Every structure is written in structure tokens, then in C-alpha cells.
Amino acid sequence: MQEVVFDMEVFPEWWCMVYTDPDDMTEKRVITSDTPNYLMKIKKLIPARCLIGFNIKGYDLRILNGIIHNCDPYRLYELSKAIVETDDQTDPFNNYTFWNKFNFCDLYDDWRFGSLKEFESNIGMSIRESEISFDKCNLTDDEKEEIIRYCKHDVEATVKMLEFRREYIDSKIMLSEMFDIPLSTALKSTNAKLCALVLEAEPKKRTLDTKFVIPKKVEKYLRENLPENVISLFEYLNDDSKVVNLFDNEITFGIGGIHSTYSENIVTKSDDKYVLMNIDVTSYYPNLMMKFNYLSRNVAKPEKYEEIYNLRVELKKQANEEAKINGKSEKWKRLNAQQNALKLILNTTYGATKNKYNALYDEYQASSLCYLGQMLLAALANKIYTRIGATIIQTNTDGILIKVERNRLDNVRVLVKEWEDLTGFTMEEDFIVMFFQTIQKCGSKAKITVHKRFFIFRSVHTG
């Protein structure tokens, strides 16, 4: 499917659409309300092509839908105002009625790095703003040319973002191929929606059970290594943050995971006697779903998730072997693209399980997974602290950073191995040269910004 990057600008008496040539993305084409037979040209452009832009679901595709329904410039201007200024949902075009009329991919989906202008700034591109009011009537030819230049600049920026996010697009294409999902559907979907499609999730309504049940196989370990006042915090599922002091850390347990620090401001490094050791759980949330049955109950065949996990491991292994023998060959590119696509599914499932608008939504499973994950890490950290005397520098969602005497490293590994055997998880260890962290608190209601750095000099896999 050919890709066409486009952008639209709307004024009371005139509109323009700038788009890339379907055969040469470096060339820009322009259609305006002044263009003879503009509707025919737009209708000829659309079929069998994927329209790509930034936040086009929220704006440009709604405008384009208005155009193909013969809206005149002023009607489009009213629609533009309804979208941008008033959020008027009564406008019949300010909605998703365009969805099945176009093939498209919105680069705003799953994007976490700000606006298109911020992207332009981050890549060193000049930022162009139009000084012409969007409410201006009677545009001169010079003003129209200026608007077109501005629009072309945004299209060029979007082309660069497309290059930057090529792997994102390619993963959707690959998942479409691997799981027999229509390409147009895959490209339109967010990662979370695509994940639900791959796993064939069917939404179900359930009464939320707020009682958290500790799995039997780890209950004894948790009760032995966490004090009762910590265990009791997890009796009922809720979104409240829970702050406690344990292993000389201030710990925050929250729905986003565990976070703790030894000190707000710290600089520490490895030396001849002590070493900084970081231990992380491999694919923590995916493994919690598989080994403790925390996958969304909306998935009819839970084994499919584990099959995807195992297939990804095998494809990654094959890709690494191919790279060693033949470098980044065409075979390697395909294997790597396949494993990256499957990684997207594995890493997106948990977040989708928390999204009430997603077919995977299962609040009980998502919250239970998060609770158990935090408790298991806290219990391991506390056991290392109490048994070995190591300093716990920090904990995070899937790992623990400790400072320990070098001659006690094997003692730490024994406790890690015990934890791995109990849970079925695997931990990876890294040795850190230096770690420093500062926490800035701003205002009376402290907004905390954490700055931290660490330097790794070698990595070893355990387990």
C-alpha cells in the first residue's frame, strides 16, 4: 500500500491540503479549494493508499471527510472551530464517521514525546509558525502561498517523524501478516487495540472483586520476608499509593509499580571492597501474566500469549545466529522484524488490560499483577538486606540496585536463585561503576523530579 503523508489547513473562505507524491515522498503536491475539480482529485488520491499524518484522527481526517461530503470552505471552517476550540460533539463530522472511509495511520498514536513542533526542535529542524490568523477572510495570493509553505514544512516534519517511527509502522504490517489481520485495520489501530485483536480478546463486564489473594506458591515466602504491616497494605485492590520504610528505603507502592530510594540525593560507586549490582527481572510483567495466570480473562485462549512469548524468544535467537553468520542479511531483517512485532504484543498487553476502552480490560487481573510484582521484589530486597547486610540503593518496577561487599556476591546470588526457583522468573545482573541521583521538590505540594545516572561496565545473566 502506497504511503501518502498529508496535512490540512482551513480558513473561512479557503482550505489547502499538502501531500507527498505517492511515487516520490520527497515531492509535495497541493490541492486547495481553488483547484479545479479538487473533489475528483482527492477521491482519486485516496483509494489503495495509506494516509499518514500527526493527530489526523483528531483533525485532518475529519476535515477530509467533510470535503468528500461536499462541505464548502466556510462549513469546513465551522468544523475546524468545533474540533479545535469548542469541542462541539454535535457537529456531524466531529467524530469517527471517517473511520471506514480511509486507509490511514496516525503517528500521534502511542507517541509520548510531545507535539510535532517539539519533535522538530528535538531533531534540529527549524520551527515555522504562520502569522496569518486562521479566522482571516479574503486571503491574498501571497498569504495563500505563505500558508502552503507552512503546510509543506509540517508535511516535511511528518515525513521525518515517519522515518523515525518506521519500526512502529513495520511492526503493524508484520503483525497483520503473522496473524491474518487486515492491513488497513492494523495500521489504523493503536498498539493496545492491535494487541487485543492479536489475542482475540472479547470484552466482558464483571463485578470488581477488590480482595487481593496472594498466590499459594509464594505466600510463605512473602510472609517470611515482609513485615505484617506491609502485607496488610495489599489486602484490598485500590489505586492509593502506599508509603512505608523498609530496608532503610522509603518505599512507594503504587498502581504503577514499586519505587524506593535509600536517600533523596546520593552519589555512590564501586571500589575494591564494594560493588554496585543491579538485578532486573527478565520480561517481568509478561512472566507474571504467564506464570501466575494474570493475563486478562477476556482472552479465550490464554496459551496464545505464551506461544507468542516462546516464538519471540526463538525468533530472537535465530536472528542473533543469522547476524553472527551473515551479518544483517535480508533473512536477519525479517527475523528481527518478526521478533520486534511480537515484543510489541508482549509489552503492550498489561497496559491494555488497564484500559477500560480496550477489549482486554480486566481491572482485577491488572491490579493483582501489579500488587504481586511489587511484593515479590520488596521481599527479595528485604531478604538481601537482612541476610547479607547489603545496602539497597533503590528499587523500581522490575529491579533492585544494591551495594554489597565483593566477597558476598555469591551469597546474594544464592538468594536470587532461590527467588528464581520459587517464582519461575529469571533475573539478569549488571555491575555498575557509579550511580548518582538527585530529587528536586518543587512547591508546597512537592512535585518530585528524579534525575539519575548509572554506568554499566559488564553484564552477566544468572539463573
Task: Describe the predicted segments one by one.
Residues 26-463:
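Conserved acidic
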Residues 3-5, 12-29, 122:
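RNase H-like nuclease fold core
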Residues 1-10, 105-106, 277-279:
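Two-metal-ion RNase H-like nuclease active-site motif
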Residues 1-3, 14, 48, 273-274:
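Short, surface-exposed beta-edge/turn micro-motifs
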